[in-house]
Design a protein with these regions (language model features):
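Surface-exposed, low-hydrophobicity beta-strand/loop segments enriched in small/polar/acidic residues
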Residues: 1-126
Length: 126
């Protein structure tokens, strides 16, 4: 295969918006990571067994109020693209490392994650 020798238009697809049913008795805050649990319901991002990261909440949804039920509310989520998360002790040498769901809206590296809920790759330290 020949080396690239000219500019080309990138084939990039921006993250899309998806709506998910919310798990019972959870409050998802706008701007935090969202996972889907093993029952298929949205929860705040966390290092939970069987969870899958699906994106960032575009709105807050409180499914703890009177009359709450599993799937009783929906949350709109911006699907994977680029997002800013907090990582303790981030360093320039972390660029390119995979990160996994921590708790309280944070991400961690592999050694600090029990269930390896993959969130993405570090592309910038801010």
């Amino acid at each position: 295969m020949a080396d690239v020798s000219a500019n080309r238009d990138p084939q990039i697809k921006a993250g899309e918006i998806q709506s998910y049913l919310v798990e019972d008795s959870v409050h998802i805050y706008r701007g935090v990571g969202v996972c889907v649990n093993t029952d298929g319901y949205a929860t705040p991002m966390g290092d939970d067994s069987g969870s899958v990261f699906v994106g960032v909440a575009l709105e807050g949804v409180d499914n703890t109020l009177t009359g709450h039920a599993q799937g009783g509310k929906r949350v709109r989520v911006q699907m994977p693209g680029n997002a800013v998360f907090t990582k303790d002790t981030a360093a320039q040498t972390d660029l390119g490392l995979p990160v996994y769901a921590g708790y309280d809206g944070t991400v961690v590296v592999a050694g600090s994650s029990s269930h390896k809920v993959f969130v993405g790759t570090i592309i910038e330290i801010v």
